[in-house]
A protein has these predicted regions:
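Active-site-proximal alpha-helix that buttresses catalytic centers in soluble enzyme cores
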Residues: 2-203
Length: 203
């Protein structure tokens, strides 16, 4: 019994150390990336026409990026909501895993009217290395009517097959270059603004 406890403790230490190393690497990568945008302009110089930002946000980070894009492009904005609230905690992870496996995504309260927009930004957090299931549900229903679509994701570090998955569901649209935003602290706000501007000006 003593040896079993010893090996269990050792396993916990090893896993914990690996987790800390991963967090350190992510933090270092974030710092390096944001340094590229330090002091750069956040001015949007490109005329995108009529713009809509569609997003889903569970924790608020995706909403923060969506709000920035909306403000910087003078866009309309639409937050997706599920018809029934998703569960929380461990049950959320199990529910999402099942939704992705069965491809039965949650029903939405309402869909945005996509009529007349030149560019539609679609934002999602990354769940299980792909887009959040409410966004996949939206894309299954959406007809972009020939508009240009630019995706953006928010994540801890790895977004897996996010881009391939959302592009595969996108109908009747010209897909523009995407952007990804790791979850970062407020100290990087100005750099994130500059990154958004750099991305949009390059579309």
């Amino acid at each position: 019994m003593k040896y079993v406890l010893y090996f269990l403790l050792l396993a916990v230490v090893v896993v914990g150390a690996a987790g800390l190393r991963h967090l350190y690497r992510v933090s270092a990568a974030n710092k390096c990336e944001m340094a590229q945008y330090a002091g750069k302009s956040a001015e949007i110089k490109k005329d995108l026409g009529r713009v809509l930002v569609v997003y889903y946000s569970l924790t608020g980070h995706t909403k923060e990026i969506a709000d920035k894009i909306q403000t910087m492009t003078n866009a309309d904005i639409f937050g997706l909501e599920t018809a029934k609230p998703l569960p929380t905690g461990a049950k959320l992870h199990l529910t999402v895993k099942d939704q992705l496996k069965t491809k039965k995504y949650p029903a939405l309260k309402q869909l945005p009217d996509l009529t007349g927009y030149d560019v539609v930004f679609v934002g999602s957090p990354v769940w299980w290395y792909t887009a959040a299931t409410p966004v996949l549900s939206f894309l299954e229903e959406a007809d972009f009517q020939g508009a240009k679509v630019a995706f953006f994701s928010t994540q801890g570090s790895n977004r897996g097959t996010f881009l391939q998955d959302v592009e595969a569901l996108t109908k009747n649209a010209q897909i523009l270059p995407d952007a990804s935003f790791n979850n970062m602290g407020k100290e990087y706000d100005a750099a994130v603004d500059a990154k958004i501007a750099d991305w949009i000006n390059g579309l």
